[in-house]
Amino acid sequence: ACNQKTETTLTLSGLDPVKFQTTVNDAQTQLYTLKNKAGMEVCITNFGGRIVSIMVPDKNGVMQDVVLGFDSIADYINIPSDFGASIGRYANRINQGKIVLDGDTIQLPQNNFGHCLHGGPKGWQYQVYSANPIDSTTLELTRISPDGDENFPGNVTAKVLFKLTDDNAI
């Protein structure tokens, strides 16, 4: 019997979109590719709202990937990092993981030497965003963070819009 091979279309940077498909917290991860008329390519995963690769021409016109990242969603999950991610609820460090709101002290998770860094150990960089591909150059990602998410107060809806222009700007 013959085995049929399934052809996989790789991105310009050599990424296999299949390697970015998995389920995290009951949500499906994907790789999205934006391309412009100039040939530039930006690859984004909805896991953490991350830019995974950016292919741009160097001074000699040779396309080069200028992003430090991984080749699969498994690496982003198993080797925790903030590479290319959208950070939230808070970017940077909150001293001792404590905030005061209306006179009440709120203790946030401490994930960085006794401090809360980039929204805590389950920050937005480790969550799956809802994706809305608008056209070949535009992707909108949405993250809904309910009250109490990592002990942060209030409901937050965050939208990240990635737009690749024909003059190679994002």
Model-derived regions: residue spans:
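Surface-exposed acidic/polar loop and edge beta-strand patches at domain peripheries
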Residues: 3-170
